[in-house]
Amino acid sequence: MDTFDSARESLEGYLRRIGCLNDRYRRGEIHVHVPAGLDEDAPIDDLVRRCLPDSARALDAASRSLFYSLPVAFDPAHSVGPYLATVDRDPEGEPYRFLDMGAMIATQAFGENDPRVVEALLRDLPYVTSRFAHSEYQTALSLRLKAALDRVAPKGTPRHFVVNTGAEAVENAIKAVLLNRVKTSGEASGGSIVSFEGAFHGRTLGSLAVTHRKKARLGFPTFDWPHVSFPAVDGTPRESARREERSLKQVWDLIASVRMPRAEQRRESFQRELEAIDGFLAAPGGDLDAFVRAQREALGEEPLRRARRVAAVLVEPIQGEGGVHFTSAGFMRRLRVLTRIYDVPLLFDEVQTGWGATGRLWAHEMFDLPAPPDAVIWAKKAQNGVLFVSEELATFFQEEKKFNTTWEGDSVGMVRLLAVLDRLDLDQVARTGEHARAGLEAFARDYAGLIHGVRGAGVMLGFDVVRGDWRDALRERAFRLGLVLLPAGERTLRFYPRYDTEPYVIDEAVGLLRRAIEDLIRGRNEPAVAAGPEIRVGTLECPIEAIEAVELTPARFAELESQIVAVEAERYGDASQYPPDVLRAGRRPLLQFPSAVLAGTLSNPGALGLALRDRVSGRVVAYALGSALEGHDEEGVSADPRLGENDTFYLHALATLPSIKNQVEVENLLLTRIRDQALAGSFSHLSTLIEERVHRTGPEWLRNAQVLQVVDDYLRSGIRFVYLHTEIDGAGAPVVVERRRTRR
């Protein structure tokens, strides 16, 4: 037998199979196919062992691997479009299939086993049988890719550097702007890089310095660089405008003084510059270079010299990992002019958004910037990492091989990208995105108590689930039904169809979402809105003088966890409060916080917690905990007028045993103690989403708190919650906000 006979036979079978699969997919004959038992109320790992045994064996064989997320083994050879086959087969020999609405973490523009990609890989097989070290050994393939990148390079950033991953591209962008400062301004350290809260730029050490995701950063020493608030478009236009101005002021403070002041600093100077920028942007056809020169002359040499200590501002056009958050075009235009005036490079991280995902070739094109960015970072759909830079930043790339990397990209990824680079159809992206968004908006309308905030551009879509633990539960239920979704931020689910996804596939995905959420609320009758759970006649005597307060540190919480969870369960998870079918095995109670959520809050910046314990019995009878407002994304937080000011304590969780006779008295003691704790922790304001009953029966300072939002039927529990805000230091003018009422 010829050496290649077996391979040739296998290849021919594969080509016949994918040809047939693609035909069936385009005819609408491929659908989700998962074992019926996968939806039983049992731990998912147990169900995988029972229903997907081949996947379980493959995972067991790789048990020393440090990380995997989805508990199945996929089979690329039998996958098609967004339908991912598993290695497991049904009794008829057909593979089980999951529907991927994560686009392989935003890496795939087109479907699995796309015929044109397969054809390209076969044609360029010689280039992928050996991996050339392109830093020294260029090939016709690597040079063909670099020539192709010239065609898609963003305006103003014609030079490019191919690396292996998005994080590596971010690292090289960081190095480029730091070296630029060292060489051009004599700033020995290279200065600092300003990034935004909610940002995610990678997990390598340098990229962690510009990432604002506590779980990714925790435990790693890195650069102490500043983060400013990201003015996500949310709430009223007035509120969005206030956030934008606050964020620009923070950037301006850093550029002008290289520190983040708590007090207002030279606000009149900032307002004067901002008014000048707005005036320029309002006049069509303005000469940006002339405007920048005039502003620099007015500023003088000293402010411009100080600004050199900021090496760059780095921003995502859309925060993907951070929660599919957008800001306005007006904010980005102002930011671009501000950074030009102070000669601070502006970098766009388009790792997720680049090459068509938003309906534009590059997402920053949505903003109609008065000047292009100084660098654009791309990866994901590039199948490698790519850094595009301006001619100015490219100056030092050849110096002493400071930017060298052995591989300069992976050949297989190069072939994949070249196969689809000229297939981008932005009209197709728009059509696919519009169909998906319409389906999600209808879904959100039908489940307005649980789902809201559908948003996106192109096929980069997301929606919020009312609480983070519900988001996780919904994602798991969807997975059991065969739908793969990826989380983002604190309570967002991403919905990323591929560019050429067939309409029937999107309809199927939305249908599975509907089934999944019905699983979470199945069996419930719509209850009448009540003021709160009925307070039962208590049997436990708990005199105030017999109560001791215990500060809840993470370690102390671990010691008292079982008692705290018992209080939470009796208050919000007991069958006397909810229909029994809601509490059957494998379901999460409607209002009860899982212990992992409570522990997570105590790991936040500014975390405070308190438990009240009966000295006689030693039993915890009440607890409360929370942290800085900026660490939360619950209902009402995004519209809080103090968000971004870093002076507000958010009371995240509070529960008192409903079985004690003097429940309200104990509750009020707890509320006052936690308020005092927050005041001692340098917080001047307190916000919380809390039962309306507690607002009515709480201590005077809470009864006088301003109601910012009324949430009827919270989590379809029949309980009315209110979002409260109050000043706790007794100083300052009252906050003026627009009161909202929603049915959640």
Question: What do these predicted regions represent?
Answer:
Residues 678-693:
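Conserved GNAT acetyl-CoA-binding A-motif
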